[in-house]
Each structure stands twice: as structure tokens, then as C-alpha cells.
């Protein structure tokens, strides 16, 4: 509701930290949001400093499977997860013949994988820069329902991430900035030292 009234703020909820995050621009906007929430909902807000947003990926291919078979349900999904180019996000494709699994089931599996925000096995940060290929799947003529593939595909992704962690190929991605710095000659040495100390690089 407030986000609709003040479109420049962005409100989001983190499943990992169980916190509501708001992108604000300065103290004045912070005070305005506090005031609105207090007047409308009688809630006193407390804003804490933001934390670093990490993401996770993998450094080597991993084959994984997810199985879901409670009473009168059945689905099995096999995936190949591969590292993708930085900044590419998550790509989901099928390498499976329609002779093995009908196309509508394949689309369902890919949609189920895409709809979930998958978290890595290191810090529980959002997964990114991964290519996920559907390489095999099984259904039961009588017992398979749509939600069964959702459970099996989510389990397959999770299992793949756990295998990557166990193999030492899970990767934590830290945010970084590219910027141009203009300084007097006498300050260049100090700036270069500071950048190196913070694991930065320069040209």
C-alpha cells in the first residue's frame, strides 16, 4: 500500500533473514515512512543498517536427482546444473526427449524450477548464474499429479547444491562496484593501497 503511494521505495521480504527490507533515500524518507506506519497501523518501526547482499553459484557441473513418492504420488527429476556466465541469472532448459516424458510435463518442471527463489548451501543466499538442464524424469500413469514434479524438482536443485558444497565447488559471490576515482597526484598512492586492502583492483 505504502509502496504504491511512494513508488521510489522498494519493499521486499527476505525468506532467509525473515526481515522486511526497504530501499530508502535518506533520513527524511525514513522519518516519513515511520510516521505513516505509526499513524495508520500504530506500529513503531525500527530501521537497522542494511547488510551485504551475497549470492551463491557453483564452480563445476553437478548431476542431481529429486524423488517424491508419498502414498499415491510419484515423481522423479534428474538435473544437470552447470556454472553460467556472471550476471546471467538462472537459465532452465530441457535436454529430454518427448519419448521419455511428454512435453507438458517438461514445461511444468521447468516452470516449477523457475518459480522458486533457490538458496545456496553455504549461507542460504540466493542462487544465481547457473544453467539447469532437465536430463531425465519419470512419472506414474495413475499417481503423478502436477505438484509432485514441483516437489521432486525443488529437491533435485537442493540436492545438487548440497553436492556442490560437499565437493567444495559451491561459490559465494560478493557484490562489487566499478567506479572512476579522480584524485590529486599526492593522494593516488594512498588510494591504491586502500583499494588493494579491500581486495579491489585498479587500472
Go through the PLM ranges and name each one:
Residues 1-203:
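Accessory interaction regions appended to the cores of large information-processing enzymes
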Amino acid at each position: 500500500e505504502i509502496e504504491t503511494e511512494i513508488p521510489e521505495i522498494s519493499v521486499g521480504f527476505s525468506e532467509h533473514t525473515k526481515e522486511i527490507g526497504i530501499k530508502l533515500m535518506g533520513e527524511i524518507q525514513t522519518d516519513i515512512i515511520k510516521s505513516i506506519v505509526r499513524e495508520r497501523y500504530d506500529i513503531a518501526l525500527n530501521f537497522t543498517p542494511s547488510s551485504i547482499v551475497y549470492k551463491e553459484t557453483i564452480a563445476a557441473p553437478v548431476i542431481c536427482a529429486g524423488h517424491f513418492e508419498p502414498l499415491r504420488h510419484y515423481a522423479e527429476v534428474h538435473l544437470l546444473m552447470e556454472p553460467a556466465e556472471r550476471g546471467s541469472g538462472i537459465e532452465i532448459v530441457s535436454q529430454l526427449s518427448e519419448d521419455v516424458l511428454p512435453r507438458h510435463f517438461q514445461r511444468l518442471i521447468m516452470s516449477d524450477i523457475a518459480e522458486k527463489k533457490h538458496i545456496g548451501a553455504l549461507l542460504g543466499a540466493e542462487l544465481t548464474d547457473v544453467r539447469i538442464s532437465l536430463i531425465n524424469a519419470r512419472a506414474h500413469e495413475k499417481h503423478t499429479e502436477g505438484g509432485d514434479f514441483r516437489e521432486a524438482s525443488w529437491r533435485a536443485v537442493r540436492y545438487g547444491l548440497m553436492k556442490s558444497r560437499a565437493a567444495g565447488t559451491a561459490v559465494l559471490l560478493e557484490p562489487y562496484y566499478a567506479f572512476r576515482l579522480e584524485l590529486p597526484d599526492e593522494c593516488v598512492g594512498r588510494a591504491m593501497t586502500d583499494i588493494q586492502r579491500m581486495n579491489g583492483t585498479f587500472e
